[in-house]
Amino acid sequence: MGLEALVPLAVIVTIFLLLVDLMHRRQRWAARYPPGPLPLPGLGNLLHVDFQNTPYCFDQLRRRFGDVFSLQLAWTPVVVLNGLAAVREALVTHGEDTADRPPVPITQILGFGPRSQGVFLARYGPAWREQRRFSVSTLRNLGLGKKSLEQWVTEEAACLCAAFANHSGRPFRPNGLLDKAVSNVIASLTCGRRFEYDDPRFLRLLDLAQEGLKEESGFLREVLNAVPVLLHIPALAGKVLRFQKAFLTQLDELLTEHRMTWDPAQPPRDLTEAFLAEMEKAKGNPESSFNDENLRIVVADLFSAGMVTTSTTLAWGLLLMILHPDVQRRVQQEIDDVIGQVRRPEMGDQARMPYTTAVIHEVQRFGDIVPLGVTHMTSRDIEVQGFRIPKGTTLFTNLSSVLKDEAVWEKPFRFHPEHFLDAQGHFVKPEAFLPFSAGRRACLGEPLARMELFLFFTSLLQHFSFSVPTGQPRPSHHGVFAFLVTPSPYELCAVPR
């Protein structure tokens, strides 16, 4: 084919692509559609978004366009919601209409399918309801909110304190030990087992979980989701979700081993056994979400999300204690007054410890570890803050804009536990405290996370005083964004009290 023949073909293809692009842009011209930066042909606003620091980028766009603004990622329409009023209106007032998740084409690489979507990324429908109901009821049956699970956590907290004590007051990074302790609670719930802190396979699993969550953000990921036809290019598809694939492979080995010890005649000892029991009941039902493929994804959801978010919050907590020794001393005084230095902390103590409770909540607010939450999608046309958002629009809920809202918090960019105390020193929780999101897709692990944060945090401060190592500079209080916001690397000294 000569060059002369290629020219008209190129013109036809170009016109076709421009028409397709025009079709995807047309909603921008609809009445009351949210404003936003002008999208480029084909790419949309992909080049306008800094995926290495998306929260900051969204904050800058909010200053230009307001609390509700629009983007177009290739041909995917997106609306970003900022501030308490907009976020609550979308997720609570229109809860049924915003409970869906947008399609995530790259998850096909991990084995996602119509009946195997896990819990967190599952589309809003029968499969999600089935798994949400199962997860909540199973966690409750395994002891969530009861003394049995509380005892698991306090025993793991004792192991964590012993590991801290092994450093004999010398400088070390606490993140790894925090990961291990929190992961053992999740492993007990999901697989009925506890790992030693130096178990090589356990360490590998934790590394893969950490790296896998970092793959939840990035330019290439967004491009492949926006233009899924590119997934057919092996060189591109092979570059994404490598750690998540390796994590699932490691998890498959644990689940295979666990199946060999399962006795269907006995009550389930953990979530995996409860899931296997449901699979037996669902045999012959092709519509059931209880299947081998979904088992691995549900367990992976609970393991990775439950481990990394809680351990990261604890890492923020210890960092803020060494940066604010006055706050640390006041927490320790309250621990000494209510619990003493011998008895293990219990959840029943929390009601008598308003300052410690306020500090933990302020750690969550200031750390702001999941700044953009998980994306939602509208299942019908809705109106938010006077703007019309069409059906099928992807929603980013900027939780950071709520947790750092200058109209709500007295000192939004400073660590200030008094945000959660009234004039009499009683604990109060403002409406804008939404680290677990809100509405129908709010984090199902919130009760477990609250228990772990209180018991691990109070156990550590009961046994140790934390400080910046002598001769080292004061650590930064700025975080590092990679889907989650983690503290900048730091060391501390844990001196027994």
UniProtKB/Swiss-Prot annotation:
Bilayer topology: Peripheral membrane protein
Pfam families assigned to the protein according to its UniProt record, in alphabetical order: p450 (PF00067)
GO BP annotations, alphabetical order: arachidonate metabolic process; cholesterol metabolic process; retinol metabolic process; xenobiotic metabolic process
Molecular function terms, GO-annotated: anandamide 11,12 epoxidase activity; anandamide 14,15 epoxidase activity; anandamide 8,9 epoxidase activity; heme binding; iron ion binding; oxidoreductase activity, acting on paired donors, with incorporation or reduction of molecular oxygen, reduced flavin or flavoprotein as one donor, and incorporation of one atom of oxygen
Pathway: Cofactor metabolism; retinol metabolism; Lipid metabolism; fatty acid metabolism; Steroid metabolism; cholesterol metabolism
Function field: A cytochrome P450 monooxygenase involved in the metabolism of fatty acids, steroids and retinoids. Mechanistically, uses molecular oxygen inserting one oxygen atom into a substrate, and reducing the second into a water molecule, with two electrons provided by NADPH via cytochrome P450 reductase (NADPH--hemoprotein reductase). Catalyzes the epoxidation of double bonds of polyunsaturated fatty acids (PUFA).
Protein name, as recorded: Cytochrome P450 2D6
